[in-house]
Regions:
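Walker A/P-loop
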Residues: 132-153
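Conserved strand-helix element at the start of the C-terminal RecA-like helicase core
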Residues: 159-169, 320-329, 334-361
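Conserved helix-turn-beta segment of the N-terminal RecA-like "Helicase ATP-binding" lobe
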Residues: 167-200, 365, 369
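Conserved helicase ATPase core of P-loop NTP-dependent helicases/translocases
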Residues: 201, 357, 369-405
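Post-DEXD/H (motif II) to motif III coupling segment of the RecA-like Helicase ATP-binding lobe
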Residues: 233-234, 241-296
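Conserved interdomain linker/interface between the two RecA-like ATPase lobes of SF2 helicase motors
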Residues: 287-345
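A short beta-strand element within the Helicase C-terminal
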Residues: 409-422, 447-450
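Conserved SF2 helicase motif VI
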Residues: 424-444
Length: 502
């Protein structure tokens, strides 16, 4: 039996039995639930998914990655390329010999060279990408994913598409290829050959094309995606775990590449939808270890207290906590002290509104501009300038949403992270905490500062991220006194808010 490998693998329906078809469809059908514990307590758990499940609020949907399609006059079972080796083995185990006709593109471009230096572990990771061609490189934050990706592209010298969900991450790749005011170019690629592409002409005329996944969301974007489907030998996807996994999967399932690599520091997702991306791109092919600094824990009590009864909307809890004026004052005063000790401070928030208030208060109390807003609303040149200035320690403090400050922002000089957000997301916590642990000569000992609110939900969230991420992964240093205080804070249930004279 001959199967065709393109943007997907197409299996002729006539050559497999209905039983094999159903087995493949079952294997590529995924159901998602908000909380597994709720299902375990349900009397219908042994029969899920059934009609009862589909009407339950805990059921978050079903995704079928295998589908029947018609090409010309023939019918095929279409399956994702990432899962195709397993599907082919399933077919061969039933006595059917499979021959794969590979129709991946082969578009070489004028060669360009990598001229940077490698850190420990990077060469092995590049070899793994060359060997497996498809899959996910699990690399911790600050391990040099852009360096490894750029080196891979140079080695192959083929037309390349680099996808990400945020422009800042793409600019990191561009900076690695062609340099910037603060970073030398690590390749000899002509800057005219790389571009953040938006139009068909852009994609056609550049050898290294950068694009946000949002470029392909609209009807016009879908048409553009269809037009460029077979143009790229090499497709790199940065931080595959961050955006909506189903959106990433939809786009990746429509692209035909020979080398397709996803980068992620934390492939696991709280909603478990990483399985969708892994079936499209491929499994984890290599896991890196990286050198990072050891954080020290500092504690600050905010005096903020909140008592709730019954079910309270999450947004209400976040809004009340982040906009509390006395709490903002506490954060601002502490930021000024940490900056005075030489730290470059990152302050993430869940909502946009508090950002302006925190920045204003820090600068008011300091009597000069120390803090800057870092949000998606900033104009692109200004965002780029802020990143450069923070690297040079011209900017002492950035305040922004946790999504923007947690992933893809390369500021090695950042040395102090404020844990102020109501969050219990383990993959995101790992990304966020790693931001301040990049080794750099002359950098202060990195600090992760916990702001302690007398608020039950806040304690539970912080406890979860502290014991399941910070302690086992980053092995922080904490004084006996602070350790006793933090453990007491986690244990306490009664309101015992204490105010420091800040």
């Amino acid at each position: 039996m001959k199967v065709v490998k393109r943007e997907a693998v197409f299996i002729p329906i006539k050559d497999i039995t209905p039983q094999i078809q159903e087995r493949i469809k079952d294997k590529l059908t995924f159901n998602f639930f908000a909380k597994e514990k709720i299902c375990e307590e349900c009397e219908w758990v042994a029969e899920r998914v059934n009609d009862v499940c589909e009407s339950c609020a805990n059921f978050k949907g079903q995704y079928q990655l295998a589908s029947q399609v018609k090409l010309g006059s023939s019918k095929y079972l279409k399956v994702p390329v990432g899962s195709s080796p397993e599907i082919i083995r399933l077919i061969e185990d039933r006595g059917i010999e499979v021959e794969v006709r590979d129709m991946s593109p082969s578009t070489k471009v004028r060669p360009f060279k990598f001229k940077g230096k490698y850190r420990p572990g990077q060469v092995e990771a590049i070899k793994a990408m060359l060997k497996f061609k498809r899959g996910i490189l699990k690399a911790p934050p600050r391990s040099g994913k852009t360096v490894m990706g750029s080196s891979l592209v140079c080695h192959l010298s083929r037309k390349t598409l680099i996808l990400a969900s945020q422009r800042d991450w793409l600019m990191g790749f561009k900076e690695t290829f062609v340099g910037s005011d603060t970073q030398p170019a690590l390749t000899d690629l002509d800057p005219k050959r790389i571009k953040l592409c938006k139009t068909l002409e852009d994609f056609k005329t550049h050898d290294v094309c950068l694009a946000t996944v949002q470029t392909f969301y609209s009807p016009g974007g879908e048409k553009l995606l269809k037009a460029i489907r077979d143009w790229f030998d090499v497709i790199l996807v940065d931080e595959v775990h961050t955006s909506a996994a189903d959106k990433y999967a939809q786009i990746m399932a429509k692209l035909n590449g020979r080398y397709v690599i996803g980068f992620s520091g934390t492939p696991d997702r709280k909603d478990t939808k990483e399985v969708l991306v892994e079936n499209i791109i491929g499994p984890i092919i290599h896991e890196m270890k990286t050198e990072r600094m050891q954080p020290h824990i500092r504690l600050t009590r905010t005096g903020y207290s909140k008592t709730t009864k019954g079910q309270v909307p999450w947004a209400y809890l976040v809004r009340g906590m982040e906009n509390d004026k006395k709490r903002i004052d506490c954060i601002a005063k502490q930021a000024i002290r940490d900056i005075a000790e030489g730290h470059m401070v990152l302050i993430p928030t869940a909502q946009v509104k508090p950002i302006k208030r925190i920045v204003q208060r820090i600068n008011e109390l300091a009597g000069k501009t120390l803090a800057y807003e870092f949000t998606g609303g900033l104009k692109k040149p200004l965002r780029d300038q802020y990143i450069q200035d923070a690297r040079d320690y011209k900017i002492k403090c950035l305040v922004g949403t946790q999504k923007i400050l947690s992933v893809g922002i390369n500021i090695p000089r950042a040395s102090c992270l404020y844990e102020t957000v109501l969050s219990s997301n383990l993959p995101n916590a790992q990304q966020r905490m790693a931001r301040v642990l990049t080794p750099m000569e002359g950098k202060p000992t990195p600090i992760i500062r916990f702001f302690l609110d007398d608020f039950g939900v806040r304690k539970n969230c912080m406890r979860n991220e502290y014991y399941r991420v910070l302690v086992p992964i980053f092995k922080p240093v904490i004084s006996p006194k602070d350790k006793e205080m933090l453990e007491s804070y986690f244990r306490s249930k009664e309101s015992n808010a204490q105010r420091f004279d800040l």
